[in-house]
A protein has these predicted regions:
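Vicinal oxygen chelate
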Residues: 1-22, 53, 61-72, 76, ...
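Internal, well-ordered alpha/beta segment that forms a basic, Gly-enriched binding/recognition surface
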Residues: 9-47
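Short beta-strand/turn micro-motifs at beta-sheet edges
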Residues: 44-48, 122-125
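Phosphate-binding active sites in nucleotide-utilizing proteins
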Residues: 74, 79-80, 111
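Core active-site phosphate/anionic-ligand binding loop and the adjoining beta-turn-alpha structural block
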Residues: 58
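Residues forming anionic-ligand binding surfaces in small-molecule and nucleic-acid pockets
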Residues: 47-55
Length: 176
């Protein structure tokens, strides 16, 4: 895979990248490097809540016929391993999700595809004209409390369909 090094402006940190299967760039940042403190002014008083555990996974939406190339890219370049594939319902069709995980286990990606052009994944791919971040899922200790805190800060939350929790119970049983 080809590498890329863009031009950095004055006082900007140059960040190398690798060209992904679709021609987009995957930037490479040294672990623990504080790039944000160099390139951005951080607001004082912001704290990470104790019940925030980190990012559970990032979901990437992509064209159905490109997923094998993405799997090979993550396996070859970064040593990711395959976890599991599942089929997820969308109001307008089915989404097939294949999880891959980094060798250290701290990065998990869901590579999502759909044959239907009406699903949220397909609409996202069409809107952005290719693969891209579809959502980020965060892990927390107390989901209801975290939702209440986010609503107090952010205001609006997406409505939850009436059958959402019934579907979760049917799928996972008493594991909730």
């Amino acid at each position: 895979y080809a590498t890329w090094q863009g031009d950095a402006g004055p006082n900007e940190t140059p960040i190398p990248a690798i060209c992904a299967p679709d021609g987009s760039l995957v930037y490479l940042i040294d672990a623990g490097e504080a790039i944000y403190e160099r390139d951005f002014l951080l607001r004082d008083g912001l704290t990470v809540r104790e019940d925030y555990l980190g990012i559970d996974h990032l979901a990437l939406g992509m064209e159905a016929d490109s997923r094998d190339n993405w799997v090979m890219f993550f396996r070859t370049v970064f040593g990711f391993t395959l976890e599991h594939e599942q089929t997820l319902p969308d109001p307008y069709g089915l989404v097939r999700s294949l999880a891959v995980r980094s060798p250290q286990g701290d990065i998990r990606l869901a590579l999502n595809i759909s044959q239907s052009r009406a699903t949220q994944i397909a609409r996202s791919v069409a809107c952005y004209q290719g693969a891209g971040l579809q959502h980020a899922a965060f892990a927390c200790r107390d989901l209801p409390a975290t939702c209440d805190q986010l609503a107090a800060v952010a205001g609006h939350a997406l409505p939850i369909p009436a059958n959402y929790y019934d579907d979760l119970l049917a799928r996972f049983g008493g594991e909730l």
